[in-house]
From Swiss-Prot:
The lineage of its organism: Archaea, Methanobacteriati, Methanobacteriota, Stenosarchaea group, Halobacteria. GO terms for biological process: CTP biosynthetic process; GTP biosynthetic process; UTP biosynthetic process. It is found in: Cytoplasm. GO terms for cellular component: cytoplasm. InterPro entries: NDK-like_dom, NDK-like_dom_sf, Nucleoside_diP_kinase. The gene is ndk. This is Nucleoside diphosphate kinase. It catalyses: a 2'-deoxyribonucleoside 5'-diphosphate + ATP = a 2'-deoxyribonucleoside 5'-triphosphate + ADP; a ribonucleoside 5'-diphosphate + ATP = a ribonucleoside 5'-triphosphate + ADP.
Length: 159
């Protein structure tokens, strides 16, 4: 990982998996110049769901959130790049797809606030990335490798 890169957690939710959007979503991040360093197709159990959404425990929508995220497989990913968390959040769009701009993932594919296709770490929550990455991935599951396109994506890299 170079000095200006950061890692961020992204998850295609059950509705995105069921609608066959994994490839489209991965392509968008790759086309942006981000590097995939971890990916895992998995079924979330209730324990992991409670850990992941712990901040919402006690809220009226919590049980529905847990039921939804455990209802079908998800595709968990770790992406790396300069300012990766903000880059990803801008590509994902607003939590409510109805408020998301066309061209964002939720603006293009999201239909419902509760089933909004994708989860991405919050860039305003310091430490959210590390917490979520550690929750879903062991360090040895993340691959650190060079990507030849870096020189063509970032101006401070040499050609």
């Amino acid at each position: 990982m170079s000095h200006h890169d950061e890692r961020t957690f992204v998850m295609v939710k059950p509705d995105g998996v069921q609608r066959g959007l994994i490839g489209e979503i991965v392509s968008r991040f790759e086309e942006r110049g981000l590097k995939l360093v971890g990916g895992k197709f998995m079924q979330i159990d209730e324990d992991l769901a409670h850990q992941h959404y712990g901040e919402h425990e006690g809220k009226p929508f919590f049980d529905g959130l847990v039921d939804f995220i455990t209802s079908a497989p998800v595709f968990a990913m770790v992406w790396e790049g300069a300012d990766a968390t903000r880059q990803v959040r801008s590509m994902v769009g607003e939590t409510d797809p109805a408020e998301s701009a066309p061209g964002t993932i939720r603006g293009d594919f999201g239909l419902d606030l509760g089933q909004n296709v994708i989860h991405a770490s919050d860039h305003e929550d310091e430490g959210a990335n590390e917490r979520e990455i550690d929750l879903f991935f062991d360090e040895e599951e993340l691959v650190d490798y060079g990507l030849d396109t870096a020189a063509w994506v970032y101006e401070d890299e040499q050609h």
